[in-house]
A protein has these predicted regions:
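N-terminal small/glycine-rich loop or linker at the start of catalytic domains
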Residues: 2-25, 102-117
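Catalytic domains of carbohydrate-active enzymes, especially glycoside hydrolases
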Residues: 35-51, 95-102
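Distinct, well-ordered alpha-helical segments
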Residues: 61-66, 91-97
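Glycine-rich, proline-tolerant flexible connector loops at the mouths of alpha/beta enzymes
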Residues: 46-71, 105-120
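Alpha-helix-loop-beta-strand connector modules within alpha/beta enzyme cores
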Residues: 58-83, 124-131
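Glycine-rich anion/phosphate-binding loops
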Residues: 27-34, 82-92, 115-131
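Active-site beta-loop-alpha junctions enriched in small/polar residues
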Residues: 16-18, 53-55, 84-88, 108-110
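Short, well-ordered coil/turn segments that N-cap beta-strands
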Residues: 7-11, 44-46, 74-81, 99-101
Length: 131
């Protein structure tokens, strides 16, 4: 039996090169990061999770996100750019870039996840200005 729904369903497709790049140990130069993301922007995903504004100690691969933004061509793309932030400072930096439409915050109830992703405990994460 099919389930009837009276509310509209909307699906947003997100591509996350940031997630892939942050796991690569060998540094990817700004030009190469921008080239990859520009190619993804041409596809037309709803959202492109492209970089992060976190401590370079936490994710060295994405330390140049601000430089990558300057090389992105969003003029003919319908994709919205999303960046990950680990705290209020990262959120403030991200808002300096009009190109960034969405911010993601890696919250979890897992202490291990929080320690690895934002170097925070659950209590500390709950107290941030981002929640």
């Amino acid at each position: 039996m099919e389930k009837e729904t009276t509310r509209p369903v909307e699906v947003k497709i997100t591509e996350a090169p940031r997630d892939a790049m942050q796991g690569i140990k060998q540094y990817i130069p700004v030009e190469q990061q921008a080239e990859l993301i520009n190619a993804i922007l041409k596809v037309g995903f709803d959202i492109v999770d492209f970089g992060s504004f976190v401590s370079p100690k936490a994710i060295p691969q994405l330390k140049d996100t601000a430089d990558v933004i300057k090389k992105l061509d969003i003029t003919h793309s319908r994709s919205k750019l999303m960046a990950i932030v680990g705290n209020a400072k990262g959120g403030e930096i991200a808002t300096d870039f009009d190109e960034v439409s969405l911010l993601g915050y890696p919250f979890s109830f897992s202490e291990t996840f929080l320690k690895l992703n934002i170097n925070s405990t659950l209590d500390e994460a709950k107290k941030t200005n981002l929640l």
